[in-house]
Amino acid sequence: MELIKGNIASPKGFYADGKHAGLKRKRNDIGWIYSEVPANSAAVYTMNQMQAAPIFVTKDSFKNSAKLQAIIVNSGNANAVTGNQGMLDALSMRAKTAEKLAIPMDTVAVASTGIIGEMLPMDKIMTGIDLLEKQTGNAADFEEAILTTDTFQKQISFQTEIGGKTVTMSGVAKGSGMIHPNMATMLAFITTDAAIPAELLQKLLKIKVDKTFNQITVDGDTSTNDMVVVMANGCAENPLIQEGTADFEKFAAMFQAVTEHLAKSIARDGEGATKLIEVQVKGATKTEDARMIAKKIVSSSLVKTAAFGGDGNWGRIICAIGYSGGRFAPDNITIKIGGIEILNHSSQTIFNQQALDAYLEEEHIVIEVDLHIGLESGTAWGCDLSYEYVKINACYRT
């Protein structure tokens, strides 16, 4: 597997574009991804019960077959909690995109992100779709078009050889605030020219989302609009990937690399964030317990503020473990911060405070927890909680 300098349109047969339609003041705010042939596809969605209209429309596109040829996305307006009119507007976005690209409506996915509760300015949306270019667009413009409070574009591309063919996979994501996925707003789109059955793609997507996107948190809020969509158009002409083969393992490893990079990029770009926090839990009896405990630690406001202030207060970590709901033995917990052991079998150790203080000034903080009761492990990612987070969200609409 090789990291390459690419974009969401790097896999063969894919194109992308983005334009400024006027939903936001300056940046691009509408874009699409297009495959020149129908692609086997898979998707996962937010667990928030107040799901936005685009979620329902995308689910409808998957109803008859798991094939997509385009994804249309707008930012600046979530089209969430907008009633029947919001549903009609999302359907209109799908229909307009299908018409412009001359493809069936049920091969178009729709995604939106932005302010909740306001109606889409459909005149601007329709004009924006008309501006999008089918095969001569700029993928970087698409990457900008999906952003809201993000401070940087999030994308990654890899290549590997499968069955004697070069297979490319690219991913792009947005997310900065309202991030606590079970599947938060977090949008991610993955393209690949691999040939793989849709059913296997869906199974693999669910596994990788559980290990990566569902293990990040910024502020504990789960969005109405979360969506991850992957399209595999087969243009690499590799032999069809089958589960349990060496080719599948190669593809799965590349999939893991893409989703983990995007997840960590979202966590690193948390609103107002100055540090990425990574929590690694091992020694659990179940993977689910390890993941649950890791995520509870990284979700703790007290842990997040301690990270911002450079305070190695392990009491906040042990407290989060205690209410996590995961199984552990209270007398058997070991904690390290930046490799510095500060707790051994639930007793504080003698450690170098100056070294710990210096480490906590770094931009990537790793907390290791060993439960000493099993062999399973799990990782979660988040960010610190700063003054700037409050400022951004207090003034979001203005």
From Swiss-Prot:
Catalysis performed (reactions): N(2)-acetyl-L-ornithine + L-glutamate = N-acetyl-L-glutamate + L-ornithine; L-glutamate + acetyl-CoA = N-acetyl-L-glutamate + CoA + H(+)
Coiled-coil residues: none
Pfam families registered for this protein in UniProt: ArgJ
CDD domains with a match to the protein in the record: OAT (cd02152)
Enzyme class: transferase
Function: Catalyzes two activities which are involved in the cyclic version of arginine biosynthesis: the synthesis of N-acetylglutamate from glutamate and acetyl-CoA as the acetyl donor, and of ornithine by transacetylation between N(2)-acetylornithine and glutamate.
Protein's name according to its UniProt entry: Arginine biosynthesis bifunctional protein ArgJ
